[in-house]
Swiss-Prot record:
Belongs to the CDR2 family. GO terms for cellular component: cytoplasm. Signal peptide: none annotated. Keywords: Coiled coil, Phosphoprotein. The lineage of its organism: Eukaryota, Metazoa, Chordata, Craniata, Vertebrata. Residues 44-142, 192-265, 346-380 form a coiled coil. This is Cerebellar degeneration-related protein 2. It comes from the Eukaryota. The modification Phosphoserine is found at residue 311. Residues 134-153 are annotated as: Disordered.
Amino acid sequence: MLAENLVEEFEMKEDEPWYDHQDLQQDLQLAAELGKTLLDRNTELEDSVQQMYTTNQEQLQEIEYLTKQVELLRQMNEQHAKVYEQLDVTARELEETNQKLVADSKASQQKILSLTETIECLQTNIDHLQSQVEELKSSGQGRRSPGKCDQEKPAPSFACLKELYDLRQHFVYDHVFAEKITSLQGQPSPDEEENEHLKKTVTMLQAQLSLERQKRVTMEEEYGLVLKENSELEQQLGATGAYRARALELEAEVAEMRQMLQSEHPFVNGVEKLVPDSLYVPFKEPSQSLLEEMFLTVPESHRKPLKRSSSETILSSLAGSDIVKGHEETCIRRAKAVKQRGISLLHEVDTQYSALKVKYEELLKKCQEEQDSLSHKAVQTSRAAAKDLTGVNAQSEPVASGWELASVNPEPVSSPTTPPEYKALFKEIFSCIKKTKQEIDEQRTKYRSLSSHS
């Protein structure tokens, strides 16, 4: 009986609906919202994963770049070491040659002294021999003088003539005797021969002395050149210490760069932290760049807000020419930075600038379309007002800029309370430029502090 009652109650409960339609709708709505949030979260996670992948790739490229730099530094160090070894070898060779030249110069000086002594001895001998010759000549003249006196006497007597005649008869071979006497007189004496021999030796010694003097002069010149080369090589050897110190500094910088790369996991302008200031292209150059023009126009835009009017075409043409010039200058800067093998933030600034330029051109097109859609009368009145205002400004101020004229023109379409869209775009451009400039200054100060600590 109880079982039957329970079965009936269970059947009654099965017939009744156990859920509410409103609750079911709420559950379905919650499930849909949950799925939507999950899908959004999934897309966000995919974006973050993609971003992490790109950062990982950039870090890998940076690591490869640093390894290449380390290899280049090692090669440079090896080359410097080879150069130092060659300089040491050449310095030793020059020292040896210098010592040899010094020894040769000393030997030549000793030889010159010995030759001068021998020359002096020979000169004394010559003087002595000349004195002896003069004495002999004087003695010979003293012997010949009595014979001459006899010849100068008057003619001998008859007895003397007879004796002479008898002597001539005894000497049959008179001509032979005369020849012997003449030959004896013609033969030089041994003193004269010795004198001539000594004169010849003196001339030879004088020639040798002149040659030795010439050799000495040449040796002194060579000695001076060797001393100069030795001093230059000593200076080069002194400069090798500076080269070694520079190589050690570069190795320390590379080690610090590696530590920074390992310590900093988030990739926030890592390239700017690792590249020195010399590889950056300065924003402020002697020629007025695009960034300077944009910074100079900031206070004017804040003083007098720009409004859309009939002079918008003038503004667009001026802005277009400025944009083209600025884009060319940025391209030139990028080429210079690539040539210097430096990685800078100009690429990011250029991409931001190109995106903002596209937005600005779209806004200008919209403004021109809205102006074309206006009535012809409104355009004429706005142009007349612009001409009147320009005339007044010309009378008061002879020179007026295009930006000030555009700011004075009335706005026919938009209300004065709502600012135009390109004004917000300019604000965004200036904020981006200021932000990038602040980041660059921070990175430079950080790098300078690191280099000063190192």
